[in-house]
């Protein structure tokens, strides 16, 4: 079973590390090509392209400039411990033990605009380059064209290595668009999290993102390998709704708190 999640905009390079183990990202040659493109942008251009403040644009221009492909624990951090958004609040990787990291390294993948695919212990230098950004590059007009089949091929390699054919899509639409489902050698399962609001169940972005992290943690902690095991997910008040679920879309609901 392979879990896919999105990265986060918020990064943490200060907190104590939960593990000193690390691996190197596998697609750095491609990342380097994107960095070369990004370095051609001025801070105002970055601000317009990403829709961010001048201060953030300056920070990211500096990050692009400082980025270099020789990653060490001194200039980089394990991806699963560097990302700090809503998904990662639910995941709480900083509390993983060695066995959790082992399982996650085999069964969890983070999709990334700059790095393509990251394993949890892959070192990562700080960046901001969302998958949906229209950064022109030698392969096309945006990052989807840049990555082409590369991300899908990497995921197929991971599936081959673990010997099963199930992908649990907990990534956002923006990021999952970088995967080509027809070329993915797997059964695709998408958990959906609905929260009750004024008597109606709907996707509430903040809660849904955190729930994706909670589900990822649930799979990792319990070493789940079969799709039917996912329906037991009951963290923070969610319950499986069999009636509205299908074979490839599992619906979890939570009553208003």
Swiss-Prot record:
GO biological process: response to hydroperoxide
Source organism, top-level taxon: Bacteria
Pfam families named in the record: H2O2_YaaD
InterPro entries per UniProt: YaaA
A GO CC term assigned to this protein in UniProt: cytosol
Family the entry assigns: Belongs to the UPF0246 family.
Protein name: UPF0246 protein YaaA
Species, as recorded: Salmonella typhimurium (strain LT2 / SGSC1412 / ATCC 700720)
Lineage start: Bacteria, Pseudomonadati, Pseudomonadota, Gammaproteobacteria, Enterobacterales
